[in-house]
Regions:
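N-terminal auxiliary interaction/assembly segments of multi-subunit proteins
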Residues: 1-144
Length: 144
């Protein structure tokens, strides 16, 4: 979809955050569970992903890229909603995505939250640093 090849490089049930996550998409979810999902992207991955999604080239963060990260967050949340249908974790509603710029923030998690983080590496021969190729999708959900 984004003209980008990725592979899973890690899964964790412990809350984690990328230290160089320049852009974070966040979306609320509710249904048989309640919580949120985040998409943490280094700037390079955000630019590559949105460039592929919109079939245009972006070299710096701008309103289109920020909006594109929100749309990617929405697409992933919609996929989770579909996959979790008719399970104890069924999601009936998702909110409008929000996008956080910068990495200097912390998220506090309520007691009883079930957390899952999946790390992906983007195949990008032009990017040497692993920190600029890895992004994360995180879910924090509690059954209601």
């Amino acid at each position: 979809m984004c003209d980008t090849k990725v592979r899973i490089v890690g899964i964790s049930k412990v809350p984690t955050q990328l230290p160089n996550s320049a852009v974070t998409g966040m979306i609320g979810m509710s249904g048989k569970c309640t919580g949120f999902m985040t998409l943490n992207l280094p700037e390079r991955v955000a630019l590559l992903s949105v460039s592929g999604l919109l079939q245009d080239e972006f070299v710096k963060l701008n309103p289109q890229v920020i909006d594109g990260v929100g749309e990617l967050t929405n697409i992933i949340a919609g996929g989770l909603e579909t996959k979790m249908y008719n399970t104890p974790w069924m999601i009936a509603n998702i909110t409008i995505p929000s996008v956080i710029l910068g990495s200097n923030y912390q998220i506090s998690y309520a007691k009883g939250i079930e957390y899952c983080s999946v790390s992906f590496e983007v195949e990008d021969p032009e990017t040497l640093s692993i920190q600029d190729r890895v992004f994360m999708v995180n879910t924090s959900l509690m059954q209601v």
